[in-house]
Curated annotation (Swiss-Prot):
Top class in the EC scheme: translocase
SMART domains in the cross-refs: AAA
Originating gene: atpB
Organism from which the protein derives: Nasturtium officinale
Biological-process GO terms, alphabetical: proton motive force-driven mitochondrial ATP synthesis
Residues the record lists as binding ATP: G172, G173, A174, G175, V176, G177, K178, T179
Protein name: ATP synthase subunit beta, chloroplastic
Domain of life: Eukaryota
One MF term in the entry's GO annotations: ATP hydrolysis activity
Catalyzed reactions: ATP + H2O + 4 H(+)(in) = ADP + phosphate + 5 H(+)(out)
Modification Phosphothreonine occurs at: T6
Pfam hit, one: ATP-synt_ab_N
Subunit architecture: F-type ATPases have 2 components, CF(1) - the catalytic core - and CF(0) - the membrane proton channel. CF(1) has five subunits: alpha(3), beta(3), gamma(1), delta(1), epsilon(1). CF(0) has four main subunits: a(1), b(1), b'(1) and c(9-12).
EC number from the UniProt entry: 7.1.2.2
């Protein structure tokens, strides 16, 4: 891994040390720049345009070289707005790709695609920077062990477990609890694994990014008093940014995560919201550069761009990056090239259900729709696998019986089916869990439930040991012992009322 230890010296003019070119043409966010013969920049080099516009306002635009056109001209894509630029303005070749600050100084801060802080909390220590373009780890460095990444969230660990160093797709509409689930995962990785998280906001609404930041401060994921104790770094390239910024912001977030993995040797969670917007931005840039479009108007390099990003997200012998990517499915068409290309890289999917959220069951993870390649007996063990399969079968049977119950009522079912329904309702409620980050809103203390405890709890429910307990005893509790204690309390309360 290449880390640049750079010390900025404002006294030395950049122009004295770097190649200088001039803007020859401007088409929206695309610039053509002419350089002297023999002084051409490399592909992906950063170019900086500094000067003043016609009103005397200062201009500072960073671009990235995308094409060498011949005749000593290059074509570059701007990372910020190009208003005020004119032909003939000086352009400085920085001699290397975009580099962003990495390390502990990034925690608790919000950055843009260039690694500049945008939260008005002052400058960031930029002595340690890293280029956003680099190769994926070599085969020899990879950790080939298949191990589960324990999240402490019952429904995830039991039914759709995450792989350490894997990639997880997070599917869910607005208002079903994506943000709260993301914040709980950030909180749990910090407490249970001593890890940190990086959140990449790629082409989503600025309002959502602001809401997430405020909620993180409120729940303690970001510590305003002592930023070093924060558990997350945020990188935003929202939907009002030029396509160049939206295309590269995912790489900026990934570069920060790689430093924590490779240098600090930590387990890292990388959130990308939304991976579809990364593809969408690549499609816009491809059209601006004049490339022939491929299927459904997407860029011909779609698979390559996705592979370049996804292959860097992996486990090495030093640490791991586990990535959770929100996936927008355009027009709910799973065969669209963007989601279809994403699915090829995913190890697990976590699907959030509006129906469960409406019932008040949080996290509203759909136990039947969520999947994982890790749920195999040789990886998770026979006990875990059998318990998960029995839970799914019980819930599936309950789902099939719901129409009959709605029309004829519960009394018309056979004894066996009534028992299945009762257990399924207990399981459904036991899959809910109080979150640490939601303590502020709910008043219930959060619970981290280990995998062994989770399996034990569901086995006991399936065995019929708790058939006599009321189903509300299983709602929003941690392990099974809390459910039995809650049942005792409920019984005492009902006796007192009588």
């Amino acid at each position: 891994m290449r880390i640049n230890l750079t010390t900025s010296d404002p006294e030395v003019s950049i122009r004295e040390k770097k190649n200088l070119g001039r803007i020859a043409q401007i088409i929206g966010p695309v610039l053509d720049v002419a350089f002297p013969p023999g002084k051409m920049p490399n592909i992906y080099n950063a170019l900086v345009v500094k000067g003043r516009d016609t009103l005397g306002q200062e201009i500072n635009v960073t671009c990235e070289v995308q094409q060498l056109l011949g005749n000593n001209r290059v074509r570059a894509v701007a990372m910020s707005a190009t208003e005020g630029l004119k032909r003939g303005m000086d352009v400085v070749d920085m001699g290397s790709p975009l580099s962003v600050p990495v390390g502990g100084a990034t925690l608790g801060r919000i950055f843009n695609v260039l690694g500049e802080p945008v939260d008005n909390l002052g400058p960031v220590d930029t002595r340690t920077t890293s280029p956003i373009h680099k190769s994926a780890p070599a085969f020899i460095q990879l950790d080939t062990k298949l191990s589960i990444f324990e999240t402490g969230i019952k429904v995830v660990d039991l039914l759709a477990p995450y792989r350490r160093g894997g990639k997880i797709g997070l599917f869910g509409g607005a208002g079903v609890g994506k943000t709260v689930l993301i914040m709980e995962l950030i909180n749990n990785i910090a407490k249970a694994h001593g890890g940190v998280s990086v959140f990449g906001g790629v082409g989503e609404r600025t309002r959502e990014g602001n809401d997430l930041y405020m909620e993180m401060k409120e729940s303690g994921v970001i510590n305003e008093q002592n930023l070093a104790e924060s558990k997350v770094a945020l990188v935003y390239g929202q939907m009002n940014e030029p396509p160049g910024a939206r295309m590269r912001v995912g790489l900026t977030a990934l570069t920060m995560a790689e430093y924590f993995r490779d240098v600090n040797e930590q387990d890292v969670l990388l959130f990308i919201d939304n991976i579809f917007r990364f593809v969408q931005a690549g499609s816009e840039v491809s059209a601006l550069l004049g490339r022939m479009p491929s299927a459904v108007g997407y860029q011909p390099t779609l698979s390559t761009e996705m592979g370049t990003l996804q292959e860097r997200i992996t486990s090495t012998k030093k640490g791991s990056i586990t990535s959770i990517q929100a996936v927008y499915v355009p027009a709910d068409d799973l065969t669209d090239p963007a989601p279809a290309t994403t699915f090829a890289h995913l190890d697990a999917t976590t699907v959030l259900s509006r129906g469960l959220a409406a019932k008040g069951i949080y996290p509203a993870v759909d136990p039947l729709d969520s999947t994982s390649t890790m749920l195999q007996p040789r990886i998770v063990g026979e006990e875990h696998y059998e318990t998960a399969q029995q839970v799914k079968q019980t819930l599936q049977r309950y789902k099939e019986l719901q129409d009959i119950i709605a029309i004829l009522g519960l009394d018309e079912l056979s004894e066996e089916d009534r028992l299945t329904v009762a257990r399924a309702r207990k399981i459904e409620r036991f899959l809910s869990q109080p979150f640490f980050v939601a303590e502020v809103f709910t008043g219930s203390p959060g619970k981290y439930v280990g995998l062994a405890e989770t399996i034990r709890g569901f086995k006991l429910i399936l065995s019929g040991e708790f058939d006599s307990l009321p189903e509300q005893a299983f709602y929003l509790v941690g392990n099974i012992d809390e459910a039995t204690a809650k049942a005792t309390n409920l019984e005492m309360e009902s006796k007192l009322k009588k």
